């Protein structure tokens, strides 16, 4: 009845896992008791679980990302400590993690940081900012937005269930065959990996469709393509990449599923299977994924640099074309991830050259931002510190990437810690720093008060120096010959560098602690740091023309755009920032429970597939189909906001401003 699932599926023998699970269960129980005492279950269900408001959905994406960041960073600390101990002359020769546990940790770390930290951060910021920047009241398909969120949350939950029930994959975050095939990974770890990513990937694809339609069809009157803010432009290109690449991931996972469940031979070593086909397919998705993460971050820095330099963005048109070129080129560089596969010299040369070429439009952006700051009235705060930190770290990571684009060098450095350092250089120095800058920048608009500058700067310096301590030694270790994913028998000569890397990880941890303190201090002092103007940074784009936080309908009157920086131009010409008092009634979407329910049954479907509980699998599948049909037949999905209601809400907002 329960397939492979039994009491033996719980790893009682592993104290680290059991203690972690007990702590998680205890925290969950404490939170549940607090919510019950406060009688907030109904509120959470109606206002958050069922919401279609893009601003609330954005908050939940960002909250999910930070929760998963703690899990992913805990994995990182354990890996660093394991390598530090094993490489020690006098330390524990085997460390504290057995190889099978270490392999699960580095696999989970990669999956969490890409799929459940970086992606939710980027999608959360897109969710909040894009509709406001284009002068829209919501996204094109509010229900899809809610559904995408819950598919992402429940896929993250499914992955975390593997911590206490069964195991996670021991294959690396991309699960290369034949190691991920049933013959070499007969446990449920790879199945957890497949179904978590499959559910999450479907949610991400739906998000991309939603935002493409939103940007194309719901822009303000007068906002043509070259009046769109850069962040929205980069989000547009990102969603094109998602639509083009994520179906490849879906198909790759489906083929691997058929191999494991039905005995097919797409990627096996026998019966005509070809594991290199999988490697090509996964990287046709995987390399655009890097640009899916970094392009919105480029948009964030474009907004930040222009605002805090008090200047129009230098080379707006060249920035847009550079973004488009990167979007196109990102699909013709994937083979540089496996120059050692055995392709011909001509094939390797082609992909090496395209990899070098893609650095050109990226370099254009760097110079655009530098020239924007040049002779500008630059205000240095924590947001600009994240930006300057990005310019330094990302440039180093980019140069390392160009070095790796040379096949002759890649043959020596492939699968070494040099590659790990490069990857973290661009993801942490680029994506993470950028998202922190964006969250700090738009935090007043999101919550109505500003974050503490003092703690924000402290957090930045810990992250900045911690990053260099943690990852610069890995470049040297890679050149010295240390390969990635080692947990045993590490050369003691590497110990000094691994010690510095471990200290850097601790510094980053202190930075995370400072960020937690920053949030608590900011909440405590929120009345002192409240944003009553709606424009705390003297911004340039439309999101700053509404209140902080915006009302649920964003704009009582939809703006009309005449300039590229329309709000900035209106302030320059001494026009009032208040919107005209000429209201009309409009439709707003109703909250819906269907997104949560479909996400929940998708979780059950994935869990039952992992454990071969086929009766539950088919029940979950048909319930999902039933819910989709019922929702598609529902015509009562919106309501009208009357002129009187708008006037009353705007009156209350104005009173709060004066208070």
Swiss-Prot record:
It is a multi-pass membrane protein. Cu(2+) binds at residues 287, 336-337. Ubiquinol oxidase catalyzes the terminal step in the electron transport chain. GO terms for molecular function: cytochrome bo3 ubiquinol oxidase activity; cytochrome-c oxidase activity; heme binding; metal ion binding; oxidoreductase activity, acting on diphenols and related substances as donors, oxygen as acceptor. Gene3D superfamilies: Cytochrome c oxidase-like, subunit I domain. It is found in: Cell membrane. The chain crosses the membrane at residues 15-35, 57-77, 110-130, 149-169, 193-213, 236-256, 281-301, 319-339, 351-371, 383-403, 417-437, 460-480, 500-520, 588-608, 610-630. Binds 1 copper B ion per subunit. Binds 1 low-spin heme b per subunit. This is Cytochrome bo(3) ubiquinol oxidase subunit 1. Residues 1-14, 78-109, 170-192, 257-280, 340-350, 404-416, 481-499, 609 are extracellular. Keywords: Cell membrane, Copper, Electron transport, Heme, Hydrogen ion transport, Ion transport, Iron, Membrane, Metal-binding, Respiratory chain, Translocase, Transmembrane, Transmembrane helix, Transport. SUPFAM superfamilies: Cytochrome c oxidase subunit I-like. The cytochrome bo(3) ubiquinol oxidase complex is a heterooctamer of two A chains, two B chains, two C chains and two D chains. A ubiquinone binds at residues 71, 75, 101. GO terms for cellular component: plasma membrane. Cytochrome bo(3) ubiquinol oxidase is the terminal enzyme in the aerobic respiratory chain. Catalyzes the four-electron reduction of O2 to water, using a ubiquinol as a membrane soluble electron donor for molecular oxygen reduction. Has proton pump activity across the membrane in addition to electron transfer, pumping 2 protons/electron and generating a proton motive force. All the redox centers of this enzyme complex are located within the largest subunit, subunit I. Protons are probably pumped via D- and K- channels found in this subunit. Its EC number is 7.1.1.3. Heme b binds at residues 109, 173, 424, 484-485. It holds the Pfam family COX1. It is an enzyme of class 7 (translocase). Residues 36-56, 131-148, 214-235, 302-318, 372-382, 438-459, 521-587, 631-659 are cytoplasmic. It comes from Buchnera aphidicola subsp. Baizongia pistaciae (strain Bp). InterPro entries: Cyt_c_oxase-like_su1_dom, Cyt_c_oxase-like_su1_sf, Cyt_C_Oxase_1, Cyt_c_Oxase_su1_BS, Cyt_c_ubiqinol_oxidase_su1. Belongs to the heme-copper respiratory oxidase family. It catalyses: 2 a ubiquinol + O2 + n H(+)(in) = 2 a ubiquinone + 2 H2O + n H(+)(out). Its main location: membrane. Fe(II)-heme o binds at residues 291, 414, 422.
